[in-house]
């Protein structure tokens, strides 16, 4: 996934958190806002309570991979932030993908038919 797809500045993150709409479950929350850009932008937020650095980095890698798989289906007019809750620490990859997919559909960031 190219670097242009990630939210890099604090101002962009603050904008998403300030004007947010959200969907969530016990493991993840997705905050999103519509924005006029040629492609979607996203960020991943994981708190320090989520295991050690190795586990946090592994979770971020998994989420980046899931988002990159759906990159052709995600609505390009949105910015979103995926917040990872500590309970998701014990989930296997298949359940992480299932939960993220359901939340992306619920937020209408992807269509139901795009589900892999």
UniProtKB/Swiss-Prot annotation:
Give a yes or no for keyword Ion transport in this entry: no
Q: Which reaction does it catalyse?
A: Endonucleolytic cleavage of RNA, removing 5'-extranucleotides from tRNA precursor
Q: What top-level branch of life does the organism fall under?
A: Bacteria
Share an example GO biological-process annotation for this protein. Answer: tRNA 5'-leader removal
One GO MF term attached to the UniProt entry: ribonuclease P activity
Give the Pfam families listed for this entry. Ribonuclease_P (PF00825)
Q: What is its EC number?
A: 3.1.26.5
Please indicate if the UniProt record lists Nucleotide-binding as a keyword. Answer: no
Keywords assigned by UniProt, alphabetized: Endonuclease, Hydrolase, Nuclease, RNA-binding, tRNA processing
**InterPro entries for this protein:** Ribosomal_Su5_D2-typ_SF, Ribsml_uS5_D2-typ_fold_subgr, RNase_P, RNase_P_CS
List the GO cellular component terms: ribonuclease P complex
Kindly report, in one word, the top-level EC class recorded for this enzyme. hydrolase
Q: Outline the subunit composition.
A: Consists of a catalytic RNA component (M1 or rnpB) and a protein subunit.
What is the documented function of this protein? RNaseP catalyzes the removal of the 5'-leader sequence from pre-tRNA to produce the mature 5'-terminus. It can also cleave other RNA substrates such as 4.5S RNA. The protein component plays an auxiliary but essential role in vivo by binding to the 5'-leader sequence and broadening the substrate specificity of the ribozyme.
Q: Which NCBIfam families match?
A: rnpA
The entry sums up its family as follows: Belongs to the RnpA family.
Under HAMAP family, the record lists: RNase_P
Protein name, as recorded: Ribonuclease P protein component
Source organism (scientific name): Acholeplasma laidlawii (strain PG-8A)
């Amino acid at each position: 996934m190219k670097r242009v797809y990630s939210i890099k500045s604090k101002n962009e993150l603050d904008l998403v958190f300030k004007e947010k709409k959200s969907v969530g479950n016990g493991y993840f929350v997705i905050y999103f806002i519509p924005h006029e850009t040629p492609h979607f932008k996203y960020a991943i937020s994981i708190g320090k309570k989520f295991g050690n650095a190795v586990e946090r980095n592994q979770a971020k890698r998994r989420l980046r991979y899931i988002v990159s798989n759906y990159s052709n289906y995600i609505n390009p007019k949105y910015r979103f932030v995926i917040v990872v809750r500590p309970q998701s620490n014990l989930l296997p990859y298949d359940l992480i993908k299932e939960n993220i997919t359901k939340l992306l559909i619920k937020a209408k960031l992807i269509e139901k038919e795009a589900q892999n």
